[in-house]
Amino acid sequence: MAATQYYGTGRRKTSTARVFAKVGTGNITVNKLPLDEYFGRETSRMVVRQPLELVEMTEKLDINVTVKGGGNTGQAGAIRHGITRALMELDESLRPSLRAAGFVTRDARKVERKKVGLRKARRKPQFSKR
């Protein structure tokens, strides 16, 4: 059974997604909920489906995801990254097309920390001339 299941770990911001893909009918489950129930926003659902639509495997794979940390955007990005890695494990010849679409690269942007003496990460306190 393990040979028919493909795994990929995806990360984005503070979210981590563990993605298991196997041949099936196109069901996507996130934390034991259907994709449409888990993500309220259409954009998040679209982001998750992007790699599958690119390689035209939307109806051919069942995907089961466990995702932790972060918010909606981070989780959707992490799932997309994980699905991409699972697809590459399934068929290495998909790598160039996924790379060209920008799904293989891990988005390294994270929230910048707040600095001492500043209001936020870069926002300085208001300056009064007089």
Curated annotation (Swiss-Prot):
Q: Which UniProt keywords apply?
A: Ribonucleoprotein, Ribosomal protein
Per the UniProt entry, what is one GO biological process?
Answer: translation
**Molecular function (Gene Ontology), one example:** structural constituent of ribosome
Keyword Mitochondrion in record: no
* One Pfam assignment: Ribosomal_S9
The domain of life for this entry's organism is Bacteria
Cite a GO CC annotation.
cytosolic small ribosomal subunit
Extract the InterPro entries matched here. Answer: Ribosomal_Su5_D2-typ_SF, Ribosomal_uS9, Ribosomal_uS9_bac/plastid, Ribosomal_uS9_CS, Ribsml_uS5_D2-typ_fold_subgr
Q: Does the keyword Ribosomal protein apply?
A: yes
Q: Which family does it belong to?
A: Belongs to the universal ribosomal protein uS9 family.
- NCBIfam families (UniProt xref): PRK00132.1
Name of the molecule in the record:
Small ribosomal subunit protein uS9
